[in-house]
């Protein structure tokens, strides 16, 4: 019996430790990107509303996203902020709640996305020790990438690296990407040989049809392209 006592005590301690975990809850208009250096699997269509957090200090990369009316059509599109990093000290099995600083309803999503401000509260109304740093890491739009030739920025990957860094949280800036003009100034006015265009790569084809389109058609194309993101 004596040999069983230490084992029983150990099992009780292990059970207590596993039960001692907090939760960070976010509304639908926010999205988890990374936690302590690891990506968080979440998306607009598979929203993750809470993260379980063990005692200690955690770095969580989050961004704001909301569906708004499109400027060019009657359809809707998503507005996304650059990621911001929350450093949160967890000292108990509390329920933490994140929301926009202005309240549950963001009146001007596009303006808010430029500089998202948040507040964190605790379910028991206790004090919350946290810091927030906004980054300047942004995803280049689909249309911009079509005509610049740039590769898409891995926002989640970079955010994961930022949350895994030791020391103070710093703003994350995307690495500069060299770009080159692929459409010359003369091509805006000179006639285009359609037979050559048919042999061009997809990017050149899109550039060709973009130059031929009127303003209304361009706006319709941009609205469609945004809806594909």
UniProtKB/Swiss-Prot annotation:
Pfam families: DUF2057 (PF09829). Residues 1-21 form the signal peptide. The keyword Phosphoprotein does not apply. Keywords: Signal. InterPro entries: UPF0319. It comes from the Bacteria. The keyword Signal applies. Coiled coil: none annotated. Belongs to the UPF0319 family. This is UPF0319 protein Shew185_1615. It comes from Shewanella baltica (strain OS185). The lineage of its organism: Bacteria, Pseudomonadati, Pseudomonadota, Gammaproteobacteria, Alteromonadales.
